[in-house]
Amino acid sequence: MAAGRPGTGCGDHPLLRLSGIPADFLERRPAGPGAGAGAGEAAVRRAGLPGRGGGAGQLAALPARRRRRTGRPDTGLPHARARSRPGVFRRAGAARGGGDLLQPPAAGAHPIPRRPRRLSRRAVVRRKLRGGLRPLRRPPRQRRMGFRQPTELRQAGAPAHRLHRPRTTHRHAVRRAPGRRREHPCAARTADGGLPAGGGLAALAAGGEDGRDRPGPAWLSRRRQHPALAGRQRARLSAPRRQPRGRLVSGHGGVLARRLLWRVLLFSLCFTVLAGAVQLFFEYRREMREIEARLELIRSGYLASFERSLWDLNQEQLNVQLRGLGDFPDIARVSLQSADFNLLQGDQRPRGMLRVERFPLSYQPPGGERRQLGELEIAIDLAAVYRRLVSGGLASLLWMGSFLCGLAVALSWLFHSLVTRHLWRMSEFAGHIAEGDLQQPLRLDKVDRERDEIDAVAAALEDMRQALRTDRRRRDADRDELRRQVERRTASLRRAKDQAEAADRAKSRFLATMSHEIRTPLNGILGMAELLREASLGERDRQRLRALATAGEGLLAILNEVLHFARLEEAPDVPEAVDFSLRSLLEDVLTLLEPRARENATRLDLWLDPQVHDGHRGAEQFLRQVLTNLLGNAVKFTEAGEVRVRVERLARSAGSERLRLSVADDGIGIPEEMRERIFERFTQGGDAVTRRYGGTGLGLAISKRLVEALGGRIGVESRVGQGSTFWFEIELALASLSGATPPAASVSALEVLLVEDVALNREVAQGLLERDGHRVMLAEDAGPALALCRQRRFDLILLDMHLPGMAGLELCAGIRRQLDGLNRATPIFAFTASIQPDMVRRYFAAGMQGVLGKPLRMDELRRALGEVGTSVPALAVDAALDRQMLETHRRLLGRHKLAGLLGNLLGSLDEQLPLLAEALDQADLAEAANIAHRLSGSCHSMGLVALGAGLGELEREALGAAGVDPRAWGARLGSLRRDGAEALRRAGFLGEADSAAG
């Protein structure tokens, strides 16, 4: 079959184009067995390709000289040297034309090896000039990527860029299974191992242009290779490509390089804009100076000539002068106006921004007065100036921007070349380490072998790999031992935790018991002392009474300090921040300690910095206790001296100020070795001081804890025999006080229920209350208390928390759940010796409104009674209404619409309650339950919780078929309805008119 015809696949093959052979050359050659020895085959041989044609003709066409030089017998078998170099034979004896040049010799053919003739440099140049030989070189990209070509194919004359074979380490390397012989990708083979029909060029075309698609026959790429190297190469080809888990960059570009590029570009843009703006500003100033210079030139050099010409009435000269001015740069219009002439040079109505300058023209003849001749008007075209500035600025901006962008790109490329590609390699290495592969070392592909920071990081990563390997081996060895140690330690910690929890529970029980057992008799001692103060006693008995009261107060102070410090160690309290007056607080503390100071002949002095704001907001309770402790110590250790309290402002910021409060005395002082430990618990100045002055040594420790809880610091300065100065610094928020606190109003007589099981405590509390005019009812336990609450309404209920049979919390809940509701809104105060913070929170959570601690103080009792009068309405409102629900309704519906709905509800109640009472009278419990159910749902949906709860309770009793008292329920529902309407009016949800209408 002729080449170039269908089936050959080589008539228009790229190898023919690259070798310089015409496309129709093979078609023009004669067909037949001996046609391969003609001029066409000679041209093919000159081009460096094996000839094509019949086998016998080709063999006959060989010169006799070459046949004699080979000297090989016609055995029909390939020579040993020929077998070692497959693919370079010229087939002879083929019956068909266009045989494959790259196919193994057929059986019976006599293969003759052919060596490529080496040409001298002169011959190569001569052939290049004639156009018969084109040097074939690998393209630069192939040389750069490291492609190589088989020696056999080069000797066969195939083009290098078509028959190249990539290195196995390249990412486009053909992967094959282990044990499979490597074959050239350009040689396609048939099922029996041979090449497809159509010749070697057709086989190359079938293999694809890039030669990476189809594997060739095994004999085409048979090479000698070391077995170990071959095995390593197979392992590299068969191993899957691993991807690190944490990729530093995507693709071949680095995130850091792109980020650097964008930031440099952004900086370049900002710098370019700024530089352009600065340059534009200076150019603008230069243009304005030039305009001013031209105007000054006109003023100094042209006005005199204009005045002379105008005086001489020389119009021609004036026109010439105007044209001269019009030739100045940026002059849009020049006009001369006078009584004789109106001359104009330039546009009559120029467009754009103009700057108009007018110069008056006057002339003074010799010996005469100066006369006004006219006015010269010059219009300067600022738009032209601005256009020139903009064009120049844009040009410089583009130039600088291009330069800086190029610089940024160069820097980013350099950064990628020097840094990010190595970071990518190190990220892959770190990914392998993260996956647990610690066998592969880290190697960087660096052109510059000089060590730098990247090498330091790589060395650190390699050291980390070695350390991880060592640590893994050591960790595996220590794992079992560590597990056993952890188990033993866990068991020990669990036992210690159980013991600590048991000790903490025992401590809490001990403190609660101690507080209750000591405060209860103290309440009787101090209460009786308070009652006996107004009794008719002699002077000696009064002194004994004062001694008794002083001893009781001292015992109470010690108890309070011990319990307070225990609470602080357990969990420091954070009292509520309130608004207070600092001056009033200091005066109250000084007034409290003034009797003790008078006994020691000690004078108290207060100095308050005028710059200190009076109103503050903060933990007034903590501050009061710290001042009381410090002043109490100063008064106790000072005899016939002076105690000075100073308050100064250290700094002030928006909404707060930092204060320094100091308490100085002239007492005994503190030794130097004790100053560092003076704020520790149970620490005093020494054993002699403890024996002489007494005390627990907890006051300063408590003060330090409280100051630290306030965010401040505390310290002391002292000298033995000269006195001490205790100071602390805190920061307080500023507050505006509404005004002076009004004096406490006299409390009207109240109905008080006192529930106390100890007779002495009942007698003390009753005596103190009755002395102020209050009426007191007594109850020993919960039963009589509940009975009294059902019979009458009280203004205040005092409950002891430790009652026989029923605790005070349960009794409070029972009073709140009483059906008649007489005392459901009555204030209930806890009257107990258990005043720990967690207990106080439980009291308030149970529905109590206050706590009175034992021993009972008269001032605390009066303060609580004073709050009762104002708290009762609020408590009644809170018990009758769900304020949160009503506030939500008012926010969604509006005030007027909510008032209308509440009025309709009250009107519906007025209509339905008589029907409900009638159903109860007629014993129609089903109808009564139905009406109560409807009204209860309406009341609950509108926030009348007390009335809704009463109706719900009535519904349950009616459905239970129990005995229902119609008269009691009628009175109760009427009272609940009136209380609900009054609560709505007091809370502002219902006006007077709406309430009356309801």
UniProtKB/Swiss-Prot annotation:
It is a multi-pass membrane protein. Residues 161-183 have a biased composition (Basic residues). GO terms for biological process: arginine catabolic process. Autophosphorylated. Activation may require a sequential transfer of a phosphate group from a His in the primary transmitter domain, to an Asp in the receiver domain and to a His in the secondary transmitter domain. It is an enzyme of class 2 (transferase). The modification Phosphohistidine is found at H516, H933. This is Sensor histidine kinase AruS.
